[in-house]
Amino acid sequence: MINQRVAMAEHAKLAPSSAHRWLKCPGSTALEATLPDKTSPFAEEGSAAHALAESILKMRQNPFSDGRRRTYGFDVKEYIGTYPLLKANSPQVDEEMIEHVQTYIDTVWQLANGKMLQVEERVDFSAVIGVDNSFGTADAIIVSSDELQIHDLKYGKGVKVDAQNNEQLMLYALGALHQFDLVYDFKTVRLFIHQPRLNHLSEWAVSVEDLKDFGEQAKSGAQKAMKMATLAERSGLDALPDSAFSPGVKQCLFCKAKGGLCFAQAQFVHNEVKGDFVDLTQPLAPQLSDAPKRITLLTPEKMAKLYPHVDLIESFCKALRNRVAEALHTGQSVPGFKLVTGKQGNRTWGDEREAETLLKGAKLKQEQIYHKKIISPPQAEKLLKKDKPHRWAKLEALIERADGKPVIAPESDPRPAIITTPLNDFDDVTEAALVDKSI
């Protein structure tokens, strides 16, 4: 049976997963504390993948039960169809989860060969940053005589995360160092971020000395964040000074306070769109009316400076839409806006069987009543690859894939740059074209 990760009511005062935020923006902790944590099907799926990986790694660590060696539970495929979280309506292990969790397990197990492995280990870094109740859970810790490894499984497939200077894992590593320092003489700490669904494994090595230098910086940042949280708790959010907030792409992108609650972030986004200061106390339309024209006038250097902020600007707009909708749905007033009935959904048959009978009675042909379509290559792969590999090999030879369309990536991306002629693959963004599209 799969072991369930115990859900504890206890929470860290400064969540390590948000360290990239509160270290840069000390006021963010106070703002986020006023908002509830929201779960999602994606988060539940990630929890299920973690629970599955934990169960198998621990089973491999201790293969005996009642003095006898187990003959099951070591292979991810044995868990197909199970529910790792052991609760109704939770994610079920499917072929995709098996493939990606297996990738993570194989990597960790190979790296842990001959070394000490700890799975889902709580690490406390309270003493490091000077804030009580500061802890997190490392997915895997591997210990050898002179090296400490911290492994983090991220099951999502949204944004690639780099292990280099990753604040969350560095805090985990500092907590683990504090735990093992008296026994081991570590020289190097190696951080790993596993994102199997993105085919991404990021690894970064840092010296113990450099890691401890980061710990001093983290201590200073943590003290500032706690000071702002205490001030807000005693005197309200309005008491927080402007200097408590430091908006930016990294710290704002997944902040719960984005989209209207955080004035500093709203100011930052509008200033980026305008290219100048925007007075949020005045009507915005006149101030932003020339924003589309501004895009056509940007130099390549200015575009390079603005482009990394696009995701943040888009996420701000989405979060603001959601906040307004949530307010109106809960009966709050948003000046100038109201809820109305939207466009009706697509027409569907209320009773498909009766509709089928009537269509047949109308003397329609089979091909007129039904749509027949061959299954897709991924569907065929699931049905045949395991049980009929030779048949699947013949089908696989028939598969075609269109070339990927050009996408924008930072220069650090390992993929080779495409040499192309100007504007042959992207939309026309000349001023005349933008004017035409706006009419």
Swiss-Prot record:
It comes from the Viruses. Pfam families: DUF2800. This is Putative protein p51.
